[in-house]
């Protein structure tokens, strides 16, 4: 078969198109585990156990594989030929991730023992300056498994009602009741585990009282309310199933927060706002407002009193949620990494993007995760490598939006030493061997001239580990020129110190010597979820949506030290 590409107006370039065929190693494996060019069910079972590492498999498991292959027209009653074996290896039921979306981790520990799928400014459709506010991003986030939704609450133009908007910008406004309604309707569509509604509160006490009634009426029995402000331990995700938790600053901390934010506001204007707010507090029945609003709050957000020096001291009698910017986190990670880990063993730590990310870009989530930060807040409307890592992390544990932190972040050493993710002395625990054989499906999911106008694509792949600094590494294959079905046949090794905090990131691009290389697919997933063996790795687009046909054939081997 040939493909023709026009060059200018009169010339035509012809390229021979190869079909997808098994690499030599796959052919050899088939011959090793088959007889007379057919692989029987018993021989397939031996392959599945010995090569794929599926020790739980039995003959019925293999018969199910054979049954599925009937739909590909490559099945024979006496077994499968090489083509059928290759189709099995590239099939959806040979994924590197678990085939069923089941929650398998212990969900009975405190909330602080889990990473939570967390959104930032969840109502924005685009940039942070002048995009629209809408309920649609909230719906999409919840249906994608996000468990922490953030709403910024401000007085409307009349000052008589609360509305959702990004204050100090030209973004549009959204009705608070609409936002609450879609949270209620979509909170538990894909996961029964609790949704945390983070309210960034810029309201007067009068409006706080109105919001308290609105929230209580909307969520009713789904609203989890904890009257004990001095709880020493957060409840577990299991005990909070189908519950909505409110996290915000208690009313008494509202004025303190406004004062601390004064660096970007004119002093006289800020002083007048504080004075007006103080008068309202005095004029209203402060106690009743505080009680109504406090009763909503089940995760109390504490102030960062004392700056960098004292913010991680914690309180042995009370757990809180502390928020800090990515910049503050980076500073603390360099100087007080173990203190961050210790703080997050009991308390919740929320990280948010720096204020200069006007384009709604994101930051490296691993900096927060390797230090135990549970709520690494992301702009879900922005695409790129860091969002792929976020999406990859929360493929774990059945995609329920909660991933249990590894023991290294929760337990101290025999002499009380706390894990330091940036240590240069971490021992190697295991070696990951990743072999990338080939890829297929681009010719079915993309137009003929999508990558190159005058020739088939020149694909190469990048394979990397994102984790603690010593584990982070990336490699790339050679470029396979003019091929819709690239064959790389390349193996990479990754010595890993903390594999339980590692993400495997894979990207494919089309090389172009004159312009920027074209994106051709990506995927990312936790190493803790990977099934060893030869697997079909499906790729996703920039937004994280899976392609229908594009996939890679890869092999994963973990060798403990």
Swiss-Prot record:
It is an enzyme of class 3 (hydrolase). Residues 256-266 have a biased composition (Polar residues). InterPro entries: C2_dom, C2_domain_sf, EF-hand-dom_pair, EF_Hand_1_Ca_BS, PI-PLC_fam, PLC-like_Pdiesterase_TIM-brl, PLC_EF-hand-like, PLipase_C_PInositol-sp_X_dom. Ca(2+) 2 binds at residues 452, 510, 512, 518. GO terms for biological process: abscisic acid-activated signaling pathway; intracellular signal transduction; lipid catabolic process; response to abscisic acid; response to cold; response to salt stress; response to water deprivation. It holds the Pfam family C2. Residues 21-54 form the EF-hand domain. Coiled coil: none annotated. It comes from the Eukaryota. It is found in: Cell membrane. One of its GO terms (cellular component) is plasma membrane. Residues 267-276 have a biased composition (Basic and acidic residues). The production of the second messenger molecules diacylglycerol (DAG) and inositol 1,4,5-trisphosphate (IP3) is mediated by activated phosphatidylinositol-specific phospholipase C enzymes. Required for secondary responses to abscisic acid signals. This is Phosphoinositide phospholipase C 1.
